[in-house]
Amino acid sequence: DSNSDNIELMGSHVERSMGMPRSRKDSPDWRSNVSMNEFKKVKKAFNEKGINIFAYKPPCMGTRNKDEEIEYAMKATKALGADYVTTELTDETNTKRISYYAEKYKVKVGYHAHLQASDTAWDFALSSSNNSYINLDIGHYIAAGGENTKETLLKFIENNHSRICSLHLKDRQAGKTMNPTGSDNQIWGEGDTPIKEVLLLMQKNSYDFTATIELEYRIPEGSNVVKEVIKCMNYCKAVLDS
């Protein structure tokens, strides 16, 4: 309904739809045995609606997950036809493990950061494998505060554009910590995140990585998620057409 045609698919949703048990202790076994044909069916269903899955984010690539789950993540990404599997920045040992399976299956990995985002946060991941990329949330980068500013964000993108797989777009306030209500997530254009400047930089330099809408601000009364996603899309279009 929002006319979105390129998405990052969240694993928790698709796994539940395939019948993954709710018990965490049963999840590894399910992931080890689920047929990749199920993911090919998901790809087909989205393709029939004109939607491309450019990235898959399964919740099973952390330090406590088994090797078989990391391997599953790579296989599922390929079955979905996605360009990237995305996951959270993790420790060095786990990054090496992920890199091993990424190279084995020839899958690119986009690492996401929250408030630990900085100009050096991705250094180890990028050095560990040529298959490692940056999944940059520009709202989290600004909200982290400290040395992170609008100017450093734009420079970071310029300096690392060849290793960025995608951006998450949201408008957060500078130097605000994460909170349960997400009250510092603003309607686009009302926060401190330079969404406009980032989009224009992408346009100016013809960067080919994806910028995705991540709707996290409180939905205004009388509206809904679909309407707000459309507003965000129109915001982007207005910037790029200006």
Tell what function each PLM region has.
Residues 1, 6, 45, 49-133, ...:
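Active-site acidic/histidine proton-transfer and metal-coordination neighborhood
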Residues 1-6, 11-13, 122, 127-242:
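Histidine-acidic metal/acid-base catalytic patches
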Residues 8-41:
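Glycine-rich, proline-tolerant flexible connector loops at the mouths of alpha/beta enzymes
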Residues 13-14, 28-30, 59-63, 89-90, ...:
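Short histidine/acidic/glycine/proline-rich micro-motifs that form metal-
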Residues 27-33, 57-62, 83, 140, ...:
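The substrate-binding groove and active-site-proximal loops of carbohydrate-active enzymes
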Residues 28-54, 129, 195-198:
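Alpha-helix-loop-beta-strand connector modules within alpha/beta enzyme cores
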Residues 36-40, 67-71, 92-95, 118-119, ...:
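Structural motif corresponding to alpha-helix initiation and N-cap regions
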Residues 42-52, 80, 101, 105, ...:
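A structural motif corresponding to the C-terminal end of an alpha-helix
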